[in-house]
Amino acid sequence: MSRYTGSIYRKARRLNFSILESGKEFTNNKSKKGVKVPGQHGSLIRPKLSNYGEQLQEKQKMQFMYGLNDRQFRRLFAVSKKMSGILTMNLFRTLESRLDNLVFRMGFAPTRRGARQLVSHGHVLVNGKTFDIPSALISLGSVVELKPRAHNLPLVKLALESKAVAPFVEVNKKTLSGTYVRYPERNELPADVNETYVVEYYKRLVK
């Protein structure tokens, strides 16, 4: 399965879940409850899902939120499975350690898609070296910064005006640099994802 590049808004409505983590996809609706499934006429009633269907839906939520294709997600799950500790938190920590995600969490881009663009175009340094691979896993204590030429990009300016900084990173908004201080706690991450279902889904596939 390739990375989903279609409308985030359409996918968010189908999953009844904010992929952008801002709720922006639902700003034209009074609430997420009762949002119609995309299609010719939508659907007023969502069918009850089987256990597998629930696992698949939660996997899709997490997959689209972090902007990964299925192969990338399986690889990260395999990495998380080899780590000591609780697998569900290991999975979140691995996902949160991706470079594109850290650029997003530090408030340098309004979305993860925008963060991937900054990384891919060579605008990001990690510990003083250019990194252009969005999927690179970054170690705790690493310093992530934007090159000076990126400071005036509209994408970056928009993020700095509106994007909150995650509590597990420290950011200097004057130099546009940040440090990955610690792994996030569960209550600092999106609550609308059931990571246990995601783990159950991949346990059958990744040995």
Swiss-Prot record:
Entries under Gene3D superfamilies matching the protein: Ribosomal Protein S4 Delta 41, Chain A, domain 1, RNA-binding S4 domain
Molecular function via GO: rRNA binding; structural constituent of ribosome
Domain S4 RNA-binding span(s) in chain numbering: 97-165
Pfam families associated with the record: Ribosomal_S4, S4
Subunit structure: Part of the 30S ribosomal subunit. Contacts protein S5. The interaction surface between S4 and S5 is involved in control of translational fidelity.
Function noted in UniProt: One of the primary rRNA binding proteins, it binds directly to 16S rRNA where it nucleates assembly of the body of the 30S subunit.
NCBIfam families, alphabetized: PRK05327.1 (NF003717), rpsD_bact (TIGR01017)
Protein name: Small ribosomal subunit protein uS4
Species per Swiss-Prot/TrEMBL record: Mycoplasmoides gallisepticum (strain R(low / passage 15 / clone 2)) (Mycoplasma gallisepticum)
